[in-house]
Amino acid sequence: WYHLMNCGFPLKLSGETDFPCMSSRRVGQGRVYVQMGKVDRLDFGEWCDGIAAGKSYVSDGFAHALEFSVDGQRPGFGEVKLSAAGKVTVKATVAFAPATPIGVAYGNVMPSGGRRVVGDTVNLHAPRSMDYLNGGKRKVEIVVNGEAVASVDVPADGASHEVTFPVNIEKSSWVALRHFPQLHTNPVNVIVNDKPIRASADSARWCVDVIKELWKFRSKRISEKERPAARAAYDRAEAKFRQIAKESVTH
């Protein structure tokens, strides 16, 4: 997801349990919360429109970003425009449950596989526990183009906490809030001098490599009649990301 957004693709985040495939513990371990504003009744179509627009955040239900904005702009409601590199103000209201289940999926048990599998709900990395972790603090991070640029520890006490961050923006970027691995907002794009987001050539090259791997394994399942058209589509995608790599910052 980060790699695609670094290439300027506005892919919106959503989440759900996919019970029992992604999580066999219970329905509702993965959730999406949509900003609907003040409504008299919930309209499912409008809720879906909110997901499509990115007016949402994903969570496990024990961590929440009740408000999140960049220079007053919330995810899915528009972009922040800057004429040159400068500073933006990120504000959020976050809340964390006073008691959180103990487990790898909630980030409070380190699996033998290390940090890269923290939050995984597919595999059982440690014995199941019915115990809860009470209190403590949760690290809230501001992410710009995939990198954490600021953070603050917030009490897990069930109360709402307002946090504010001044963030420097050097080029067109996406900005989001996360608490790993329980919470992530959709981003707000900050566009500098009307330039597209081209945050990382490495991200574009990663996408090229993924396309090659996909073709290697998927092409065998494509009929011979349809394979030339499929190959052309893969080639167009690869060429697009190669062009983005040329336009991007190298790192």
Predicted regions mapped to residue ranges:
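C-terminal functional module detector
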Residues: 2-12, 17-251
